C-alpha cells in the first residue's frame, strides 16, 4: 500500500446524529424496555430503532408486501432479524435443538439462516417474541450482544476440521478476543434477562461511552485456508504454528468491502500487514487496535468511519506505531504464511485425532424443510444423536464435527435421506449470496433468491466450455454494503437496481485481490453473455492451474486493483 501524506489523527467537525444517539442512550438502554410494551406499532420508535442493533437485532419489514400494506393504510409488517454471537461458529447440539424449536414456532419464515459471519440469524421475529428469543438464547448459554452496529462483531475463526489441536487453540483465542472486546454495559442483561439494575455507574474502558465510530470485524485465520476472507475484516490474527502448535499471530489491519455506488471517496480495501506477535500479547494488541480506531476513527461521516479509512488518513506506519505504544510491544517481522484456497471441503474429512468431520453444503445457508429435502428436520435428527458439536463456516455451510467411526454410517444415513448430501457442482459449492430481498431494507437487487437459478445458467456455461470440474469464486450481493463479499470474488455481482448489477472481475481464488468493475448496471442476460465469452476464453487460453480471476488480469481483460484507495475507481 502506498502511504498518503498523513492527515489529522482526529477529524474535527459536527458529529453525526448516531454519535448523539449513543451518547444519550444511557449505555445502550434508550427507552427500549418501554417501547417493548407499546402494542400500537410492530416496530421500535426513534433512537430505539437503531439502538436495538447493539443488542444484535435489525428492524426489517417484508418488502414483497410493503406496497400492498401501504394501500391498505397499514404500517409495514415489521419484524426483527436477530444475529447470534457465536465466536468461531461452534454451536452445541443442545443449543441447535433450542434454536430449531424457536425458528419453527416463533418466526414468520420458520428458517435458520447460516451467515458468512459464521453464525446464524433468525428472520421474522415479531415484537412480542423479541424478549423471549433473548431469554431462550440465554437459557442455552448464548446471546446476541454486539453482533451489529458500532462494536466488535462476531469473531470468525477458520473452520479447520483436520488439524483438531490447532483449531482448538485458535478457537479459544477467538472466544477470548470476543469476550475481551464485549461492551461492559448491563443494558442487555437488564432489558432482556430481567436482571436487577445495580446502583453503579456503567463504564466502557475499551469501547468508550459512544462506542466505536463504526462496525468493527475481527478474525482468527489458520493458513493455508482463507475461508473467513480476512481482507473483508478490520483486524485479523493469522495463526503461526510450529509442529502443529500455535505460537503466535501475524496481525493484519484495515480490510473492508463496503462501498457506495458512485461515491469515489468509498472503496474496498485489503488489510495491511503490521507484524508478528507472540500469543501472550494477543489481547493487549487487540485492545490497542480497537482503542486507536475508537479515538482516531471519523465520527463526522459514517461513510468514512471504518478502520480502512483511518489507516489511509493517518498512514499505516502511524497507526501501527500507536498500536505498539498502547500495547507496550514492538511487532516482530511478519512470519511466512500462504493461502491456497477458501472454499469448504464438502463431505467427510478425517482429523488427525481420528474423528471424522462431515461438511454439508447448505445453499445460501438457508435451513428449512423444502419439498423432498427436509434439511431442517434432518439436522434436528442429527443433533439429537450426535455427541460432538456443529460448526458454522464462513461459507454458510455446516460441519458435523467430531464424529467417531462407529457413528459415521448413522449420521450419513440421516443426512442423505434429508437431502443434506445431494451432489452439487464445484461451481455451486463456490458461490454465495447475501440475504437481500425480501427482508433486507438496504437491498437494491435480488441475491439469495437469484443465486440458485443464476448458478444453473453458469453451470451450463461451464459444461458448454468443458470446465464443469472447475470453479470460479462467484458471489452476489444485493447492495454495495457488500455482505455477500462480492468485492473479494473472482466474479462479483453488486446489486444496483431490481434485476440489474455491476459486474466485477479480477479478484482471485484465495481472496487477496479486490475485483474491478467491468460492466455497470447490466441485466442477467447481459451478465451471462459476457461470462459465456470470457469462460470460453479461459477454458482455451488459461495456463495450468490458472484461476479465472488471474486469467482475466493476465489476458488484459481487466486491470488489477493494486492500491484500492487510489485506483479502484480508475
From Swiss-Prot:
Binds 1 siroheme per subunit. One of its GO terms (molecular function) is 4 iron, 4 sulfur cluster binding. [4Fe-4S] cluster binds at residues 434, 440, 479, 483. InterPro entries: CysI, NiRdtase/SiRdtase_haem-b_fer, Nit/Sulf_reduc_fer-like_dom_sf, NO2/SO3_Rdtase_4Fe4S_dom, NO2/SO3_Rdtase_4Fe4S_prot, NO2/SO3_Rdtase_4Fe4S_sf, NO2/SO3_Rdtase_FeS/sirohaem_BS. GO terms for cellular component: sulfite reductase complex (NADPH). Belongs to the nitrite and sulfite reductase 4Fe-4S domain family. Alpha(8)-beta(8). The alpha component is a flavoprotein, the beta component is a hemoprotein. Keywords: 4Fe-4S, Amino-acid biosynthesis, Cysteine biosynthesis, Heme, Iron, Iron-sulfur, Metal-binding, NADP, Oxidoreductase. The lineage of its organism: Bacteria, Pseudomonadati, Pseudomonadota, Gammaproteobacteria, Enterobacterales. Its EC number is 1.8.1.2. It is an enzyme of class 1 (oxidoreductase). Component of the sulfite reductase complex that catalyzes the 6-electron reduction of sulfite to sulfide. This is one of several activities required for the biosynthesis of L-cysteine from sulfate. This is Sulfite reductase [NADPH] hemoprotein beta-component. Its cofactor is siroheme; [4Fe-4S] cluster. Pathway: Sulfur metabolism; hydrogen sulfide biosynthesis; hydrogen sulfide from sulfite (NADPH route): step 1/1. It comes from the Bacteria. It holds the Pfam family NIR_SIR. It catalyses: hydrogen sulfide + 3 NADP(+) + 3 H2O = sulfite + 3 NADPH + 4 H(+). Siroheme binds at residue 483.
